[in-house]
Swiss-Prot record:
Modified residues (Phosphoserine): 14, 38, 40, 91, 137, 200, 219, 227, 252, 254, 256, 261, 274-275, 279-280, 827, 932
Disulfide bonds: none
SMART domains, sorted: MUTSac (SM00534), MUTSd (SM00533), PWWP (SM00293)
UniProt protein name: DNA mismatch repair protein Msh6
Comp. bias regions, Polar residues: 329-351
The family this protein is said to belong to: Belongs to the DNA mismatch repair MutS family.
Localization: Nucleus; Chromosome
Gene field: Msh6
Record's comment describing the protein's domains: The PWWP domain specifically recognizes and binds trimethylated 'Lys-36' of histone H3 (H3K36me3).
Domain PWWP: 92-154
Oligomer and partners: Component of the DNA mismatch repair (MMR) complex composed at least of MSH2, MSH3, MSH6, PMS1 and MLH1. Heterodimer consisting of MSH2-MSH6 (MutS alpha). Forms a ternary complex with MutL alpha (MLH1-PMS1). Interacts with MCM9. Part of the BRCA1-associated genome surveillance complex (BASC), which contains BRCA1, MSH2, MSH6, MLH1, ATM, BLM, PMS2 and the RAD50-MRE11-NBS1 protein complex. This association could be a dynamic process changing throughout the cell cycle and within subnuclear domains.
GO BP: any one term: spermatogenesis
Amino acid sequence: MSRQSTLYSFFPKSPALGDTKKAAAEASRQGAAASGASASRGGDAAWSEAEPGSRSAAVSASSPEAKDLNGGLRRASSSAQAVPPSSCDFSPGDLVWAKMEGYPWWPCLVYNHPFDGTFIRKKGKSVRVHVQFFDDSPTRGWVSKRMLKPYTGSKSKEAQKGGHFYSSKSEILRAMQRADEALSKDTAERLQLAVCDEPSEPEEEEETEVHEAYLSDKSEEDNYNESEEEAQPSVQGPRRSSRQVKKRRVISDSESDIGGSDVEFKPDTKQEGSSDDASSGVGDSDSEDLGTFGKGAPKRKRAMVAQGGLRRKSLKKETGSAKRATPILSETKSTLSAFSAPQNSESQTHVSGGGNDSSGPTVWYHETLEWLKPEKRRDEHRRRPDHPEFNPTTLYVPEEFLNSCTPGMRKWWQLKSQNFDLVIFYKVGKFYELYHMDAVIGVSELGLIFMKGNWAHSGFPEIAFGRFSDSLVQKGYKVARVEQTETPEMMEARCRKMAHVSKFDRVVRREICRIITKGTQTYSVLDGDPSENYSRYLLSLKEKEEETSGHTRVYGVCFVDTSLGKFFIGQFSDDRHCSRFRTLVAHYPPVQILFEKGNLSTETKTVLKGSLSSCLQEGLIPGSQFWDATKTLRTLLEGGYFTGNGDSSTVLPLVLKGMTSESDSVGLTPGEESELALSALGGIVFYLKKCLIDQELLSMANFEEYFPLDSDTVSTVKPGAVFTKASQRMVLDAVTLNNLEIFLNGTNGSTEGTLLERLDTCHTPFGKRLLKQWLCAPLCSPSAISDRLDAVEDLMAVPDKVTEVADLLKKLPDLERLLSKIHNVGSPLKSQNHPDSRAIMYEETTYSKKKIIDFLSALEGFKVMCKVSGLLEEVAGGFTSKTLKQVVTLQSKSPKGRFPDLTAELQRWDTAFDHEKARKTGLITPKAGFDSDYDQALADIRENEQSLLEYLDKQRSRLGCKSIVYWGIGRNRYQLEIPENFATRNLPEEYELKSTKKGCKRYWTKTIEKKLANLINAEERRDTSLKDCMRRLFCNFDKNHKDWQSAVECIAVLDVLLCLANYSQGGDGPMCRPEIVLPGEDTHPFLEFKGSRHPCITKTFFGDDFIPNDILIGCEEEAEEHGKAYCVLVTGPNMGGKSTLIRQAGLLAVMAQLGCYVPAEKCRLTPVDRVFTRLGASDRIMSGESTFFVELSETASILRHATAHSLVLVDELGRGTATFDGTAIANAVVKELAETIKCRTLFSTHYHSLVEDYSKSVCVRLGHMACMVENECEDPSQETITFLYKFIKGACPKSYGFNAARLANLPEEVIQKGHRKAREFERMNQSLQLFREVCLATEKPTINGEAIHRLLALINGL
């Protein structure tokens, strides 16, 4: 039986003493329950789950918990003034429709307040009327005059379907019956129905003022100065400082919900005026972003909680009189101070709102829990952090503590104990709440606002989830979205089926519906749009050291871009420096890494700690979390991930099937060379399963095997044979990508000044992603490179078409990601058992509209693609490039065409449903012929309706009465309404009387019952089809995924080719087509760039300052003078351009093999299989590697992996150690590169002794960056150095380091002292050299007398 309550039950706690206007502002987002819940039930629901049957929701004025509040709140409410009845259109005894914020219109009775003796109050310009709500347990309250309408009966037009007051809710229908009964009575009799005459709760009066203030603030006619809502200076002590800035405090909840009131919100999409203006805990700066939040937002109901307590107390005492409620003023101040907002976020973080009046900072409640303190914390198995198997993602919560919690809070702690590493967004009604330590994160990272109370608590509305969750995820947090997965009605039904129901059962179910991390973002309609176009990978890694040697290892890897649903899986051996693994993470940069605990070697840990320190890294427990290969295969087969394509059997994708043992036809035995790869996949599958996105991603069956780029690079193969393979790619490792600044610059880590920025003019996101992959792995096959260059020239030859195509491509959305989204929405697996399918979403209509908008955007995008294909197909006959012809030619018109013919399919979708109606309503109603289930249901409905009409005609003829008609609604339809004069005659025995009215009787027959049952069944099937219509339509669209994906791939290739063509014809200065020569027996590796320029500097620095240079290595014309020298020693003055020249050579080689024109007058080269770089000087602090160690590590990689076809770029090797050590190492490296490996090398150095050593070598050629020296003398301050930036033959005599010192503004005396010291070193070096020559000369038959004289002269000069 419903218990009696007051309107106070609907609203949260009241404001501080003397601050009623601030209360009006703060209450704007407080409390509402489900639309359509009755007024009394709305108040009771706040406590029903926590303590069923208790009356603790309405805190009695005599209880200790309420005693401190009553007096203060009565004083606050005294500001409301009684006004003459003439100011109101209603009088006591009138029946009205009344609407309170967040509730539907409700039948009410106007009557005088039981103690004030008036039914009207005025606050500012607003007028309120006292009413009693008709309900099982009548309740009363003050309602705005503007929210009252005359009640004219349940049969009135406005109360019927389509009317303003119509409702199908049973509570309202019962209230209307009571109001109809009252309508037939006179005023005196009606007033006797006013039975709710208990002493008024003080909070009721104050909270009604809050409600009215909110409404009046929204009204133009009742608008008053906003400054009245500003928080006023406090008179209660230092804790209550005034707020200086005018702002509305937007609050979502009070500690009552934290305490587990567990108020549930049941969305009602039919409710008018519901929106999201109330933003829980969201700062004012965010309020404009929540643009869809308008006035009339349903407010969440709040119940009062005992101050500072964890559990509600059941309060039995009733208030005897208003006098008994008078409190002690000091106690009131102390209690009400709990409701004041701290002045700044810093104080919010430390000062509790528990009513403590002390001036010093206190701590949040969760910080006082002993078992939660770091020194006492344990995991779920009670293991301490120093235990080797400690699990930091779980938390031990004592059972006695859980038992002391209210049901809502108990559920939160249970979820938190299993997911301690997550920030939990806990759904309460239409808001996501953050509690305890999560709330502290929300305030510090998101700018939310703490709620009042000694429990840390903040929140925000549902519609803002995407923005706030993404903000936390980008900062490295992991977010769990917890949704309500049953309504209160469903909970009640569940409890009725249980034999024994505890208070913990009487709480609606909540489940984790999604865990979001950096590596698992899918950008669903809740998550929002991606912030960048490039892929972000989740990488799983398993390692095994080779038994034969401790210096090599084998990696199993699996990585996935969750926004696309594309998996890469592979297994490869690697060296002790993890070279291949470093290259992988450079080409596919992960944002999150999974690995098996205890599995990684020291070298791999060094890579993770150094190069990948910014990634989230998570160790998984072997076996239970990081699965072995066998468990992975079994899970994939038993999970049914790869069914749904018309075949009920589960078949592994070809890539995975190829990794199983050939002897096992079932596919449960891993292949010998794939165990680690499949185990790495197991780690990924486990994590995706944990994040609840395994079904939507794996069901796409989009797998690709990963092979290291240098797999085919073997130095022993026949010269040039490897380059005939179209699959062969140039290897650019992580060091090279960084040193050449291909993707990110070394200054601030952005793309400014990089090759990617220079080239990237792609119009589509998927084109940008493809360009990046092409840059990671340029081609090596001369024929493939030439075909791309042909495509560039073909496009340059049709500028008009290119302009039209470019304009069309700009209109395309990210179709690659949209296809993944559509697949996820249409997934039948997800719709069957995923928690999201049970979630109660307040903004469901908004999300449906977003899904439809995405879908229609995809359809429009594919139409644009067809136009693009058609435009270029007109001129495709003149194209020489095979690739370009393939991507623009329809498969239906040419066997070599790759672009699918989408015309028929797109026309089918144009007629599938009303696009504009679906866009506006968020609902899809399929047209005839598109959805067989829906069509069959409609056909059955028409058939049964026609059958019933025919039966009516038969009964009319049978009884000889043409006035017989059908009557009834719902399941009581199709009653034969027969005039009474006919009904009195002998009727057939099968006629069963159902109802009567004056003048006629109504009958059913067995035939009607049977036909109606068939009709109802057909209608239910229709409704079920409509409910699941969007998913099934998306699933239908996804059946042609291969065609859609092929179209995207073709347009992506076209977009990148257009990008290359755009650069090729728009470069600053001369541009040339590279000539790639296949090496053979008579053609040795060479590189010839004439008049070449740096591709990026011309964009960064405009003008004619950049000097073009010739770079020749191994060319015939050079061989005539100096022999075939593959190594060029580059010298020159500091800041003379040596490093720029070296980077320029590497970038031009990359661009040439990418298939792009290069900024040069001439470009010829044999394919480069790999570019190595040793540039710059920096240490790796995180890896514990010094500057010199980094130099030697990079050099070791060069010597270990370089082949005769490689391009090696070394800049000042040896500078990180002692001069003689550095010189010796540099000398040895040059010798190895020039004489043993014989690869194309540019080696810059300031070691002039190195130049002298190789000045006569036929394997090494000398070159330097020219400069002009004026006033060269002993005094460096008198010299003037002019850099010519021209690369010419020969060696530079000096490095002119003191010129660089002067340009850097070193003190002159320091430069002079340094110069004198340098002269001393030079003389000593010359002396030692001459002495060595003398000593060598003594071994010869004749003595070099000239050398002796020079030595003596030098010694005398010292």
